[in-house]
Each structure stands twice: as structure tokens, then as C-alpha cells.
């Protein structure tokens, strides 16, 4: 028997043991995420942007879960773009922006920024202006190999995993 679930009304097959995010990616269904880094199988759920609403068979009320950490189940109905999901994603994005230096023009990723791309995708074309952002944490350039500007960090954990899995060093925590 083939396993299947429904994404926004579209029937999608899957194999046991996959997460909702993995199945969505295979089916070319975009779910925004900032921490999931598939080449490294890095899906800690830290950014909380991959929120989806899930209805198990027989459910009348859905629950909102992170797609990267939730195993997909037979017959689930999954909504990636409804109003409830968007509002929760926007709230999560506001929380990320509240502790993020938004001087985008000074950032090396300006114009090629996943954070800005996801904000636009979820309906936040103009990021909230947190002009009272003062946190200016020290810029760490004490190492020639690693330069860290924690004011731009969104705590996704990607750099830690690349350092550990790709570089084999594990110098970051």
C-alpha cells in the first residue's frame, strides 16, 4: 500500500520515516525555513519558520507544528499557506527581527539574504523597524579563520553544523 498525505489539497506519496519538510521538498512544495540545511541533514527546529497546520485522519481541528521535526503520517492533511500558519510565521519572524541588527546595508548578505527572502514570502515585505535595537554585541575577529558578528546571528545553528560536519573541527558551539 502506498503512503500518501495531502499538501494544500495535492496528494503526495512518501516513505516511512520522513518528515513533513522532507516530503514537501521532494514534491517541490516550498515551506520556508532558516535552520534546516538538507545537505547536512540539519533540522533542529530552532528557527520555527517551517510551521504548517496538520490534520490527522478524523481531526476536525488542526495543530500547528514544525515541518522539519514532525514525522509525516498516512492520510494527513497539511496546510502550508493558510491564514493561521502565516500569522504564526509572521509572529516568529518578528521575534527573530527583535534581536537582529537590521542595518541590512552593512551586511555582506544584503541583496542575497534568506532572512529577507523568507520575510517577503510570508507577507512581511517591510521588516518591522526596531530602531531601539541597541544590543551591539562585540564583533569577534580574534581568529583569522572565523569572524563572527553575533548581531546578525539568528541562532539557526547552520554555522555550528558546517564547522562540525563539513570542516570536521567542531570549534563552534
Describe these PLM feature segments.
Residues 48-173:
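Fe-S ferredoxin-like electron-transfer domains
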Residues 5, 10-74, 84-88:
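N-terminal cofactor/phosphate-binding cores enriched in small/glycine residues
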Amino acid at each position: 500500500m502506498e503512503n500518501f498525505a495531502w499538501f494544500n489539497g495535492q496528494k503526495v506519496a512518501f516513505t516511512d520515516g520522513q518528515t513533513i519538510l522532507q516530503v514537501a521538498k521532494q514534491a517541490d512544495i516550498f515551506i520556508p525555513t532558516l535552520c534546516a540545511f538538507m545537505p547536512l541533514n540539519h533540522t533542529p527546529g530552532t528557527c520555527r519558520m517551517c510551521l504548517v497546520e496538520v490534520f490527522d485522519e478524523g481531526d476536525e481541528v488542526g495543530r500547528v507544528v514544525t515541518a522539519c521535526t514532525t514525522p509525516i503520517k498516512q492520510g494527513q492533511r497539511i496546510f502550508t499557506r493558510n491564514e493561521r500558519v502565516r500569522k504564526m510565521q509572521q509572529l516568529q519572524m518578528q521575534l527573530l527581527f527583535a534581536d537582529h541588527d537590521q542595518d541590512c546595508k552593512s551586511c555582506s548578505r544584503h541583496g542575497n539574504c534568506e532572512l529577507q527572502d523568507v520575510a517577503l514570502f510570508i507577507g512581511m515585505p517591510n521588516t518591522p523597524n526596531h530602531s531601539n535595537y541597541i544590543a551591539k554585541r562585540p564583533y569577534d575577529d580574534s581568529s583569522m579563520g572565523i569572524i563572527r558578528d553575533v548581531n546578525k546571528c539568528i541562532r539557526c545553528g547552520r554555522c555550528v553544523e558546517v564547522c562540525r560536519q563539513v570542516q570536521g573541527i567542531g570549534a563552534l558551539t
